[in-house]
Design a protein with these regions (language model features):
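Short, well-structured N-terminal submotif of metal-dependent ribonuclease cores
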Residues: 1-37, 51-65, 107, 116, ...
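Active-site neighborhoods of divalent-metal-dependent phosphate/nucleic-acid chemistry enzymes
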Residues: 57-61, 69-114
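Generic structural signal for small/hydrophobic residues in well-ordered secondary structure
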Residues: 7-8, 45, 85, 104
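Alpha-helix capping/helix-boundary segments
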Residues: 9, 41-42, 81, 100, ...
Length: 127
């Protein structure tokens, strides 16, 4: 099964945070599951670093290390994802999350997230 990690899940995994659910940990530790991080999450992290809403000592390179060190695969932004965005219900206003949702729908992935707005869409999600 293919999983798409929301940005906070990448950060919590790297920190070994107690906020990470047991289900999420189980999937993340499962060597047979395909775990992806979208370039969208790196973009979101870069913006939050710039506005100081996110603190990473090593800046954006540290975020990329988190992705690499945990064996997550990187997913680019494809045109198909962008084509879907205008057709999504307007439950979620965050453009990063809307692109993650479009990615998950197009690629038939399960999103790992705590975001209840994401969970309102007719997609597979796990927490």
């Amino acid at each position: 099964m293919k999983y798409l990690l929301d940005t906070h899940v990448v950060l919590w995994t790297a920190e070994n945070s107690p906020l990470l659910s047991e289900k999420a940990k189980s999937v993340i530790l499962d060597e047979n599951s395909e775990k992806y991080v979208s370039v969208v999450s790196a973009w979101e992290a870069a913006i939050k670093l710039g506005t100081r809403k996110l603190q990473l000592e090593g800046g954006l390179p540290e975020f990329f290390r988190m992705v690499d060190d945990n064996g997550f695969l990187t997913l680019p932004i494809e045109r198909e994802y962008l084509r879907l965005i205008p057709h999504l219900p307007d439950y979620h206003k965050d453009p990063f999350d809307r692109l993650l949702i479009a990615t998950a729908v197009t690629e038939n992935m399960t999103i790992i997230t705590t975001d209840q707005n994401v969970q309102r869409y007719k997609i597979l999600w796990l927490w």
